[in-house]
A protein has these predicted regions:
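Disordered, acidic Ser/Thr/Pro-rich linker "stalks" and the adjacent N-terminal cap
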Residues: 18-120, 131-136, 165-173, 179, ...
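Beta-sandwich interaction modules
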Residues: 30, 114-116, 156-210, 322-371, ...
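Acidic, glycine-anchored loop motifs typical of Ca2+
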Residues: 89-98, 244-255, 570, 601, ...
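A short beta-strand element within beta-rich, extracytoplasmic domains
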Residues: 121-133, 200, 280-293, 405-418, ...
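Exposed low-complexity, polar/acidic, P/S/T/G-rich flexible segments that act as propeptides
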Residues: 123, 206-227, 368-397, 407-413, ...
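Short coil-to-beta strand junction motifs in C2/discoidin
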Residues: 133-141, 294-303, 420-424, 624-628, ...
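Low-complexity, intrinsically disordered segments enriched in Ser/Thr together with acidic residues
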Residues: 664-695
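Short loop/turn motifs at secondary-structure boundaries
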Residues: 676, 723-835
Length: 835
């Protein structure tokens, strides 16, 4: 009940009287940083949704979105025809009610269709859909190409393979070419056929033909393609080259792989690939069969590992780390390819989808033969990854949020949808200092230096943006994840600047969370640089101890506090306190800040010692503060005998109000406190039970606007009390049974037994039991049985057995038992019953 009350009073401000900073619009969300490439969708009404990876897609539909460089020029995917080009786009628009038809007056040699998918795909089937109400094309041939040159000296001519030809006049509206019989060199089935180009040649004219759609059905979206667009990356050893080319969608580029056998680590034949986000993956494949060469391109073996980023205690070597972290790797492929003929295409399928973000590849087994390899090793020409479902983990980070002035941020809330198996996790960090940076972009959106920008022609110069960035050493670490909407703000406050990080995660591929808004509640700050400490710093568990909590303010260099009347005129503190509330104006913290040229705050003396060219700006800031006249202390048990001092002077008990609950102590002070001279000392007695007991402290000058007071940074763990004896020793302490002899005859004298004890070193709920036995060990009665934790217990026994009957006179054994977090403990005493 006490804990609930603490949370309730600390959350009061989010209900009324607070200012709010709300993030809820499409424009606001689009200023956040998050993986691109369809991983996150921001809707027009301001919802943040997680992207979905599709299965069995038609690769023709988005062909025009892909482009590549070929023979020195940029080429876009799309469709070309030999006749009536004005309606050619209808062939790949996904609409079967539109169609393309060649001009009947054109020669038959112009009746053809060329489709360039813009990237290499794995085709499961090609489907031609002819227009309804028109005559299907009766005779035609279908060719496909991986976009490889047929002749070295004639680079514009591609190598095509005939995959289908009508052997009798076609009369069907749909014609399909299936690639489900594709196999590798050893007869193992493959997922489909690699191709980029489709050519359809019509061999017979009809009067009213119409081709509505050409579809190329693939296993799904190729997750690998947008690695770099999402912010992913790949690092690799020096004897693998240009690994980023294995996921560029082009079969004629790739990575060479030195055949190092088991010595892959020392010879640097590895790559560590970050997809930029986590995905549900059910298959991946790669090919060593690319452009024609005079030497072999196969790998003699390899191993592949995957990870979702789960942290591990250590890594076998630094190359396994991702962003400096050790992660858990799972081996999903171990292939010895020293076979004849060597395999060139590899499909890896999973019985159940796996959460994958990181892929680690290294060569293994053979070392090759230089005469057939030209010292080049093997090749990976293209690597594809497939899956289905919502992206299981997406992280978004806010731009720097500027509240305009120092504020007391009290709580954070959010609105979203979390189906079962999904989570919205939010954390924050705050800071005192930022630097303004200028960023330069060209018209294409590429960032560059100021010098590069100024060298560009005017027509190629893009926007110049000014933005604020944190100066890291003045910023806090990320807070713990907030437990739910309305949680107390966990980062240092008051603050002017903050960052928010959101993680949208799911344990299932068929559901995902979505986020509508985040709201910060804040008010005027009580003041800056408040800190708290508690004394003594050590105590005994389960026994009353006298504690003193001190709250004080420290002034910054160059800081002054000024008082004003309601007309803005500066007055003295003494005069301000004598004014009626309606006439009082603001109390203001005025500060002067000195910076070096890099934006780091320095002292005035350091600034004056710098050469003028190395000096940064001098800034003057003013922040209105409320001061505080309420203090709340979270206590391990009910506080007693409370005393108060302000500025070292005792405050009479009738001059302040005390409210005591089981785990909180609240005081209403006789005046508002602003300055270091008015340090506040609260003395009280209470009983600690847990080692590392934290005395959290809050102050307020506005009803409900509680501001957390951090521990004094000068002293380590300044508000934490240690109980050294709890590091060892029994769970049950201070067991007392009184009286040792009872006479339960109803005369009101020694009629019942009082059993008191302290439970220590138990943090979770555990069974606490008190049981009575006779001298023969037979159970007489279980007097107490309940889930409990560390604390003082007092149990009574009136001398009756489990049936409610009076026990006969004699000696009995009283046993106290506690099932601890890691062990159990028992303690017992004898008692005597007489009549």
């Amino acid at each position: 009940m006490g804990t609930y009350f603490l949370l309730l009073i600390l959350s009061t401000l989010s209900g009324a009287g607070a200012e709010r900073y709300v993030i809820s619009t499409e424009e606001q969300w689009k200023q956040w940083s998050y993986p691109s490439g369809g991983i996150v969708e921001i809707t027009p009404d301001g919802w943040v949704k997680v992207g979905y990876i599709r299965k069995d897609i038609n690769a023709c539909l988005d062909a025009p979105k892909f482009s590549y460089k070929w023979l020195g020029r940029k080429v876009k995917g799309g469709v070309k025809v030999g006749s009536n080009s004005g309606t050619s786009k209808n062939i790949i628009d996904g609409d079967t009610t539109t169609y393309w038809a060649p001009n009947p007056e054109d020669d038959l040699k112009d009746w053809w269709v060329d489709i360039d998918l813009g990237r290499l795909v794995t085709a499961k089937k090609i489907r031609l859909i002819f227009a309804g109400g028109r005559t299907p094309f009766p005779e035609f041939r279908i060719y496909v190409s991986k976009h490889l040159q047929k002749y070295a000296k004639l680079p514009k001519i591609l190598e095509y393979d005939l995959v289908a030809k009508t052997v009798k006049p076609n009369t069907e509206r749909t014609f399909e070419v299936n690639f489900d019989s594709e196999k590798d060199r050893h007869g193992n089935p493959l997922m489909g056929r690699y191709l980029q180009n489709i050519r359809i040649v019509f061999d017979k004219k009809v009067e009213d033909p119409g081709l509505a759609e050409v579809e190329v059905i693939t296993p799904g979206e190729n997750i690998a393609l947008k690695t770099l667009e999402r912010g992913g990356k790949v690092k690799y050893g020096g004897r693998m080259t240009k690994v980023e080319q294995i996921f560029d969608g082009l079969i004629w580029t790739g990575s060479t792989v030195t055949l190092a056998g088991a010595d892959w680590l020392r010879q640097h034949v590895w790559c560590n690939w970050d997809l930029g986000a986590t995905f549900w993956v059910d298959a991946m494949r790669f090919t060593s069969e690319g452009r024609h060469m005079r030497w072999r391109s196969d790998l003699e073996g390899f191993r592949i590992y995957v990870s979702d980023g789960t942290e591990a205690p250590t890594s076998p070597a630094d190359v396994w780390k991702v962003d400096g972290k050790d992660v858990v790797w799972e081996r999903i492929a171990d292939v010895d390819n020293k076979v004849s003929p060597p395999r060139l295409n590899f499909d890896i399928k999973f019985p159940k989808p796996k959460r994958i973000r990181y892929i680690f590849f290294h060569h293994y087994y053979g070392t090759g033969y230089w005469a057939t390899r030209a010292s080049a090793g093997g090749y990976i020409w293209e690597f594809q990854i497939f899956g289905e479902g919502f992206v299981p983990g997406v992280t978004l980070r806010s731009p720097l949020i500027d509240l305009g002035k120092m504020n007391n941020i009290t709580s954070i809330s959010w609105e979203g949808i979390t189906p079962p198996g999904t989570k919205i996790e939010i954390r924050t960090r705050t800071g005192e200092r930022v630097r303004e940076v200028t960023r330069y972009f060209d018209k294409a959106g590429n960032e560059m230096t100021k010098e590069q920008y100024e060298r560009l022609p005017k027509f190629r110069q893009g926007p110049i943006k000014k933005e604020k960035q944190p100066i890291e050493k003045y910023w806090s670490k990320w807070s713990p994840v907030y437990k739910g909407p309305g949680a107390r703000f966990a980062s240092p406050s008051p603050s002017r600047y903050l960052l928010i990080e959101v993680n949208l995660s799911s344990e299932r591929p068929d559901v995902a969370p979505s986020l509508k808004s985040i709201t910060l509640f804040y008010s005027k700050a009580v003041g800056s640089r408040l800190s708290a400490e508690v004394n003594p710093r050590t105590a005994e568990p389960g026994r009353p101890e006298r504690f003193k909590v001190v709250v004080r303010k420290r002034m910054y260099e160059g800081e002054v506090i000024s008082w004003h009347d309601k007309w803005g005129r500066k007055i003295t503190e003494e005069r301000w306190r004598k004014l009626p509330s309606a006439i009082r104006g603001p109390v203001v913290e005025e500060r002067t800040h000195w910076y070096d040229e890099e934006g780091n705050e320095i002292t005035k003396e350091e600034w004056e010692e710098l050469k003028p060219g190395k000096r940064g700006k001098v800034e003057h800031t003013k922040d209105e503060i409320t001061g505080f006249n309420r203090i709340l202390i979270k206590t391990p048990s009910k506080a007693e005998d409370v005393k108060l001092r302000i500025g070292g002077r005792p405050v009479p008990p009738d001059s302040f109000v005390v409210e005591v609950r089981e785990d909180t102590l609240t005081l209403d002070l006789p005046k508002l406190v602003f300055t270091p001279e008015d340090s506040v000392e609260v003395e009280f007695s209470c009983v600690p039970y847990f080692n590392g007991t934290l005395f959290e402290v809050f102050v307020a000058g506005i009803p409900g606007a509680w501001q957390m007071v951090p521990p004094d940074p000068v002293r380590k763990n300044a508000t934490t009390v240690m109980l050294p004896s709890l590091t060892k020793g029994p769970l049950i302490r201070n067991l007392k049974i009184t009286p040792r002899v009872i006479t339960p005859n109803g005369d009101g004298y020694n009629d019942e037994l009082s059993i008191s004890f302290t439970v220590s070193r138990v943090e979770g709920l555990r069974w606490v039991k008190v049981t009575l036995y006779n001298v023969e060990g037979r159970l007489i009665r279980e007097v107490y049985r309940s889930l409990g934790t560390s604390g003082n217990y007092k149990i009574r026994w009136e001398g009756k057995d489990g049936s409610g009957d009076a026990v006969p006179p004699g000696v009995y054994l009283c046993e106290v038992r506690v099932d601890g977090d890691a062990t159990e403990d028992r303690a017992n005493r004898t008692v005597v019953v007489v009549y």
